[in-house]
Amino acid sequence: LNSCIKITKNDLILGMEVDFLLIGQGLAGTVLSHRLIQDGHSVHLIDDGDPNSSSKIAAGLYNPVTGRNLVKTWLADILFEEIERFYHEMERLLDKDLVHSLGIYRPFVSYEEQNEWVAKSADPQFNAFIKQVFTQSRNKGVKDPFGGVLLKSTGYINTLELVNGYSEWLRERNLLTKAVLSEKDLVQTKDGNWQFKEILAKKIVFTNGIQARNNTFFNWIPFIPVKGEILTVKQDYYSSEIINRGVFRIDMGEGIGKVGSTYNNSEVNLCPTDAGKKEILDKLEQLIEKEVIAIKDHQVGIRPGIRDRKPVLGKHPSKDNVYLFGGFGAKGVSLVPYLSKQMVKLMVCGEEPHKEVNINRFFKYI
């Protein structure tokens, strides 16, 4: 937007003046705006209301032990102190049931893996997140001949309820505009502020997920959009735990389970595929003994991944009042509550975030 039209403040339509204008009200925009309001700042959000946004499709899992090598997720000890505390706070604000604290049961595929987890259970780095290691099948409808590990400090957040509930909360206070933002709608004033229609903002923050790559401020960030498919299935099966091996299965009650997800960065669109459905069902068959009776829903979302698999927090290199808070991929539920606090410190106090997530690691791409 270097060629933006310059106008004077006197030319503005009389309207709302705010400290921060956030572009996008998915999970990132929801949490960051709440942090800013808590800190005493005025905000306004713009969102297109897309029902297929990744925040609305996401399963919302939080799990401290992830990846093929089953390691503690980055900053797990810090992140997981914040997760349930923050989302319980949002439950109280919105009067919604958002937090589902459930153990995650991961079956072993060999005695070698079983032995590894027995050893990990004695490791102080892991035992805070391990509830129990089973060396035999639990005979609960899960295919686990070698036993498995039951993890704690885990569960899922109902992100659809969170985002929609917070959207309503914002609308009641005239803090949300439903609009598809075009760059020509953002006009920089002579004093450096930003105008969107009748709103004048001191700072703007892009919290719009993968769409941030389409604006000229941040089109140099190496976003990697990833297509993920999720099925809602009917089975004669119930579990009070999330089952996770190859795919996750979250029990929604009455024989309904949410199962996913796929990972596809070569065919990035919102079209459900037979290949994605087959992949999920094949992996579910290897996990759960009961067959699928019916497929109730087949959803697709686009995760906003980054090349180095870490999110991006920071200020534009040449515009002091333009920021990016995004790239959370599949771990937004875990990362956003803690990193949103770092983002507020950056925008308000000038404190730089962790180097692993700092936007300056990508300045070489400009």
Report each predicted region and the residues it spans.
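N-terminal Rossmann-like FAD-binding beta1-loop-alpha1 element of flavoenzymes
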Residues: F20-H44
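Active-site substrate-recognition segment that forms the wall
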Residues: V31-R35, K56, L61, T66, ...
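Glycine-rich FAD pyrophosphate-binding loop
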Residues: Q38-K56
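Dinucleotide-binding Rossmann-like beta1-alpha1 core, especially the glycine-rich loop
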Residues: L61-K140
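Helix-loop-beta segment of a Rossmann-like dinucleotide-binding subdomain
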Residues: R68, K96-R106, K131-W169, A179, ...
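Short beta-strand to alpha-helix junction loop
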Residues: V71-L79, V149-G165, C271-A275, S334
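Predominantly flavin-linked oxidoreductase catalytic cores and closely associated redox partners
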Residues: T154-Y237, E241-N244
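C-terminal catalytic lobe of FAD-dependent flavoproteins
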Residues: D297-I366
